[in-house]
């Protein structure tokens, strides 16, 4: 084993243990961050070209499967469902496999597949990988978007059953104003509801790719059904909208900007909300406007009450 590989395995092992420790202590935000960042590192190695990797194709496949399991555990921690799909004790079975990846030759304990090449960055990772976005955006529109793999369709959820005296909210995402709207490849919006600590209160939903782009607008015209009755949302909660697009040069999906709506803004009719610079600040502590130009996210709210 080369010194480079030994050091790499030690870093992976330390990251794995940190995530599992946070998980067992109930520090879910920290655990999710650690799991997602490690998953991206494993994913990168699993997808490395043969001559750029010290691992065999079979070992890279196993590394990719471990990345998938980290994603599954991260998703389970963010889920509002009581039944976790992928448990901590399941994840812990993978630590010795990762540690001994060079000699591991048994069947993988879980029926999963390596995550696909196109990826979404973990919180905090974008700052390390991206430089000034404006400098790059000039070339982002070069080439046809059709030459890249099609993104998975949106993950929109149906409206919840109505309950007497309870209010449901439908948010129509109409359009978003951006100075370089026409250059965005496969743009979509991730919608989540977070408490003041950035913890998910409902399942996260992705819109399908935008219906059309023109000048300074990306049009969606899609309805989001809030997956919780308005009265059941905790004090200080907010609905977040993260605008994401594919960056072919770097082969990942990046958050360009975000917006959010607080509980006192929930009222029927149209609303426009300001756009903020990434990374997404779910705790709303250090907000920076994306631009001084009059560009916003345009929404329309409909309340349903029995």
Swiss-Prot record:
Domain C2 Aida-type residue range list: 157-304
MF terms (GO), sorted A to Z: phosphatidylinositol binding; protein domain specific binding
Region (Axin-binding): 154-221
InterPro entries: Aida_C, AIDA_N, AIDA_N_sf, C2_domain_sf
GO biological process: determination of ventral identity; dorsal/ventral pattern formation; negative regulation of JNK cascade; negative regulation of JUN kinase activity; negative regulation of protein-containing complex assembly
Modification Phosphoserine occurs at: 144
Residue runs in coiled coils: 27-62
Region of interest (Disordered), ranges: 128-153
Record key words, sorted: Coiled coil, Developmental protein, Phosphoprotein
Tissue distribution of the protein: Widely expressed in adult tissues, with highest expression in the heart and skeletal muscle.
Acidic residues composition bias: residue spans: 128-138
Pfam families for the chain: Aida_C2, Aida_N
Assigned GO CC terms: cytoplasm; membrane
Family: Belongs to the AIDA family.
Subunit structure: Interacts with AXIN1.
Function comment: Acts as a ventralizing factor during embryogenesis. Inhibits axin-mediated JNK activation by binding axin and disrupting axin homodimerization. This in turn antagonizes a Wnt/beta-catenin-independent dorsalization pathway activated by AXIN/JNK-signaling.
Protein name: Axin interactor, dorsalization-associated protein
Species in which this protein is naturally found: Homo sapiens
